[in-house]
Amino acid sequence: MLPLSCEAFSFAVPFGVSFRFLPDEPAAAIKLKPGQTVMVDPTARRGGSCLEVLDGVARVYCPCEETEGMTLAFLQQGDQVRTDRLCSEGICVEALTPLSFRSDAEPLQGQGFDSVNEWTLQLLRIRHLGSAELRLHALLALLVNRLGRRCGDWCDLPFRITHERIGELIGSTRVTSTRLISKLRRQAQLATPAGQPSLRLAAALIEAAPVLG
């Protein structure tokens, strides 16, 4: 089966956010460019479907108006998401890097928590830390440890997150997120390499992050 590109999907604009609907027929490879999003309708197939990331990093979030795009998980190669276990309104999958995934995967059995449940638990723990600064510190460490790589005294995350999204993840306003990020820049603990979509963080910052358990 040939890979499908984002252009093959029907277009919709809910609540000011653009996405495309996932095709009803299972596909062995669907490709998205960074910033593109597909919505998965759990009612489109009896019993739902199982998505598996083949390459890249994705953000899974709830499309409900009430939750305003609440992040459920970040997924990378090998991670799966069962659509029948999530919001009845469906889920959205956003490509943070060039992304390839399949919608006809066989669910892994006997793995305990699935990828989405485990991520949601960790994000919930972060939201309960005492201050916005601690929550940001823990969030950056979680993302780097799960999705990034260490290069000497620095750690690289292969994508950037907007200040608005950081605010959603740590339960703060965009203004607070911007202030905290600016502080890390002044302390030379965070950098955004020119011409690259990545985020660079000091290894010492990641090592000193709060332990989530």
Placement of each model-derived feature along the sequence:
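Short histidine-centered beta-strand/loop micro-motifs
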Residues: 39-45, 63, 83-85, 125-128, ...
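Glycine- and acidic-residue-biased ligand/ion/polar-headgroup-sensing regions
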Residues: 46-65, 76-78
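Polybasic "coupling" helices that flank or enter modular domains
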Residues: 111-172
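Phosphate-/nucleic-acid-contacting segments
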Residues: 147-213
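His/acidic/aromatic-lined binding-pocket segments of jelly-roll/cupin-type domains
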Residues: 29-30, 39-42, 47-54, 72-73, ...
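Cyclic-nucleotide recognition modules
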Residues: 65-123
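Cyclic nucleotide-binding regulatory module and flanking cytosolic helices
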Residues: 1-38, 46, 80-81
